[in-house]
Amino acid sequence: MTLREMIDRLLGRQQASATTAKHRLQLVLAHDRSDLNPDLMEQMRREILEVVNRYVELDLEGGDVSLETEERATALVANLPIRRVRDDVLPQVPAVQ
């Protein structure tokens, strides 16, 4: 997310339809280039949330894990609003396969 997008979001401004379409196209291209199927992407998202949630309490409604592409690089981006830092780290839960 760019600084301009973050400011627009904080001020409640709506994105132009061209900007929204561009972002969606970038997301589709990132998924295509990464060669990750949707099930694997969902599994990664769940595991990332589980690990981060051991250390901090998350606002899962406002969170997002996605692939983003800028120029020729694809990045896995996690935008996870933190409610509070946990006093004690939660124990690791064995992954269900």
UniProtKB/Swiss-Prot annotation:
Keyword tRNA processing assigned: no
Q: Keywords assigned by UniProt?
A: Cell cycle, Cell division
One GO term of the biological process aspect: cell division
InterPro entries per the UniProt record, alphabetical? MinE, MinE_sf
Q: Which Pfam families match?
A: MinE
The cross-references to Gene3D superfamilies, in alphabetical order and at most eight, read: Cell division topological specificity factor MinE
Disulphide-bridged cysteine pairs? none
Return the similarity comment: Belongs to the MinE family.
- Role noted for this protein: Prevents the cell division inhibition by proteins MinC and MinD at internal division sites while permitting inhibition at polar sites. This ensures cell division at the proper site by restricting the formation of a division septum at the midpoint of the long axis of the cell.
Quote the protein name from its UniProt record: Cell division topological specificity factor
Encoding gene per record? minE
